[in-house]
C-alpha cells in the first residue's frame, strides 16, 4: 500500500481521527445514524414509530455499547440527545447526508441535510464528518462526475473546518438486485475501483468506510452461504479482499452493511487471512439489530437488558477479531510520528 505524505493530514484532522480511535490507532466505532429505516423497523415490529422512540433507541444503544467502542456514529436529527449518554472519551462522528436520499433507484444522487453544514456539525460536537454516497465507478460519466463534484465540495468544507472526512461509498449497479448473485459477481471490481478513485487528493477524504468486497452469502465455504450458490471460491474472495485493500492509499474501515454479527466477524477474519489490513470498523446493525424486536415489543427496560448481555457480547467478540487483523489508521501515512498532533 502506498504511503501518503505528512502534508495530507493536518493537525486538526489528525486530532479528529485520533478522537475516533483507541490508543493503538484502531477505529472501533459503533454506528447509530439510521433514521427512516430504523423508525420503520420499530413500527413493523409492533413498536411506536415516532421520533421520541427513535431517540430513546439510540440513547439505549449509545449508553450500553460506547464503553466498548472508540467512537459513535450518530445523526444530528434524532441522535444528539443520545450523545450525552456516551462513555467518557468516546469520539463522535456525525452524518451529513439526508436519510432516504437514495429513493431514486437509477441515479441515487447524494444530498446533504438542509439545516446543517460541516461547521454546524462540528459545533454540535463532531470530531469527524461522515457522508454516504451510492457509487458505481462504471456508471454514466456525467452522473459519476456530478457525484464527484458533491464529494469535492464536502471535502473542501471539511478542509476549511480542519475536520476529518469519512466517506462511505456503497456499490450498486442499475438493474441488479444488490442482494442477488449477479451483483455479487460484479461487486468486487466496483469496490476496488471506487477505493482507488476516492483516494485521489481532489476529494480530501481522510478515511474510507467501505464494504467488504464480496458478498459472503455467495462465497464457497463461507458460513454465510446457506444456498449453495457461488459467485466466488474462497481463494478468489481472499484475492478480492487484498486487491481492494491495495487499491487505496487511505486508511479504510469496514462497515457491517446490515449482516449478522457472525457473518461480519467471518468477513473480518477472511480479510486478515488475505493480508488486507483495515484500520477498524464502523459497525451498527450487526451489533444491535437482533435486539430491535425486544425494544419494539417489550420496551426500554427489556432492551437495556438485551444490550448489556447480547449487544455487549457482540461488540466484545468483534473487538477480539480486530485485535488480530487491524492496523493503526496512521500506518498508511508513514507512522505515528508523521501525523503526530
What are these regions (language model features)?
Residues 1-139, 204, 229-230, 250-251, ...:
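Alpha/beta catalytic barrel-like cores
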Residues 71-76, 130-134, 140-143, 187-188, ...:
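Catalytic beta/alpha-barrel core
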Residues 91-92, 161-165, 247-260:
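Short beta-strand/loop segments at the ligand-binding rim of alpha/beta enzyme cores
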Residues 132-141, 169-184, 209-227, 251-254:
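Active-site-proximal beta-alpha loop/turn segments in soluble metabolic enzymes
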Residues 7-8, 139-149, 180-192, 256-266:
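Active-site glycine- and acidic-residue-rich loops that bind
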Residues 125, 181-210, 271-281, 287:
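Structural recognition of alpha->loop->beta junctions
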Amino acid at each position: 500500500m502506498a504511503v501518503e505524505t505528512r502534508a495530507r493530514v493536518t493537525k486538526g484532522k489528525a486530532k479528529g481521527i485520533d478522537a475516533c480511535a483507541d490508543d493503538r490507532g484502531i477505529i472501533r466505532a459503533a454506528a447509530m445514524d439510521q433514521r427512516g429505516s430504523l423508525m420503520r423497523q420499530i413500527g413493523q415490529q409492533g413498536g411506536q414509530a415516532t421520533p421520541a422512540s427513535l431517540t430513546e433507541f439510540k440513547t439505549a444503544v449509545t449508553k450500553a455499547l460506547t464503553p466498548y467502542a472508540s467512537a459513535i456514529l450518530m445523526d444530528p436529527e434524532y441522535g444528539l440527545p443520545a450523545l450525552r449518554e456516551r462513555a467518557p472519551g468516546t469520539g463522535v462522528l456525525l452524518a451529513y447526508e439526508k436519510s432516504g436520499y437514495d429513493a431514486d433507484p437509477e441515479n441515487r444522487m447524494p444530498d446533504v441535510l438542509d439545516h446543517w453544514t460541516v461547521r454546524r456539525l462540528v459545533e454540535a460536537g463532531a470530531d469527524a464528518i461522515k457522508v454516504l454516497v451510492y457509487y458505481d465507478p462504471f456508471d454514466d460519466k456525467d452522473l459519476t462526475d456530478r457525484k464527484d463534484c458533491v464529494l469535492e465540495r464536502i471535502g473542501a468544507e471539511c478542509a476549511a473546518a480542519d475536520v476529518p472526512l469519512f466517506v462511505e461509498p456503497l456499490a450498486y449497479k442499475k438493474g441488479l438486485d444488490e442482494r442477488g448473485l449477479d451483483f455479487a459477481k460484479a461487486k468486487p471490481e466496483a469496490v476496488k475501483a471506487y477505493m482507488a478513485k476516492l483516494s485521489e487528493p481532489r476529494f480530501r477524504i481522510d478515511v474510507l468506510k467501505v464494504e467488504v468486497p464480496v458478498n459472503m452469502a455467495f462465497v464457497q465455504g463461507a458460513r454465510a452461504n446457506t444456498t449453495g450458490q457461488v459467485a466466488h471460491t474462497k481463494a478468489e474472495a481472499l484475492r478480492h479482499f487484498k486487491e481492494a485493500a491495495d487499491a487505496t492509499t487511505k486508511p479504510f474501515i469496514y462497515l457491517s452493511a446490515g449482516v449478522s454479527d457472525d457473518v461480519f466477524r467471518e468477513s473480518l477474519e477472511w480479510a486478515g487471512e488475505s493480508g488486507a489490513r483495515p484500520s477498524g470498523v464502523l459497525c451498527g446493525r450487526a451489533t444491535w439489530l437482533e435486539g430491535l424486536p425486544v425494544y419494539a415489543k417489550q420496551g426500554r427496560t427489556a432492551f437495556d437488558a438485551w444490550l448489556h448481555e447480547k449487544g455487549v457480547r457482540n461488540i466484545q467478540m468483534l473487538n477480539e477479531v480486530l485485535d488480530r487483523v487491524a492496523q493503526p489508521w496512521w500506518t498508511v501515512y508513514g507512522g505515528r510520528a508523521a501525523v503526530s498532533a
